[in-house]
Amino acid sequence: MYNRVLENIFWAEPRIRCNCGSYALGVDTWFWPVVNRAEYSMREDEIRSLYICGENEETIMEKIIVKDVSNILELCPWIEQIDRSKITPNDTIIAYRLALTIEGTYDEQDDCMYPDWVDEDFHFRIRENGVWTEKCGSGEIQVCDDQNWFEEEGCWDTGYMCYTSSVVYFRFR
């Protein structure tokens, strides 16, 4: 349910119920970028399969982000995707990015890399009134350290993960 009045989200509900997605998108429950929650639990298997088939982390993130954007737009009809070049200084902007780390074992006999460990996460940030803020998991809302989040290079470092995929932008309709 859409609710941009943050006091209703963060004072009426326990803070732990809201993550980066619920904060940025204005929903009152923990937000996952999937239509069916079971889909998110299968994500690691999909990542492993793509990696075994020779895809690198960057390509895997881009494939996942395409699915996520479709799901986000389906779940949140009050927002639209916007190209970075069309963003105006007064727009309230939501930015979305992924992090992915894969550690694997190389098997020379099969000439394959087997993923032993996969760590994947998503993150949203929002710019309102020219200020970028975020909410990491069940933590407090905070102002982003670096306010130049239109940079595609580098990472969004939340202290937990480094988000390095391309950035997807949304705005409220």
PLM segments and residue spans:
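Active-site nucleophilic cysteine motif
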Residues: 12-39, 43, 57-58, 62-66, ...
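Active-site or metal-binding loop neighborhoods of secreted/extracellular toxin and effector enzymes
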Residues: 131-173
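Active-site-adjacent structural segments surrounding the nucleophilic cysteine of cysteine proteases
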Residues: 1-14
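Short, isolated positions within intrinsically disordered regulatory regions of eukaryotic proteins
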Residues: 15, 34-36, 82, 136, ...
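Residues in intrinsically disordered, low-complexity segments of regulatory proteins
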Residues: 10, 29-31, 77, 116, ...
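Generic recognition of cysteine residues
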Residues: 18-20, 53, 76, 112, ...
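...with weaker cross-activation on analogous glycine-rich loops/strands in unrelated enzymes
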Residues: 42-139
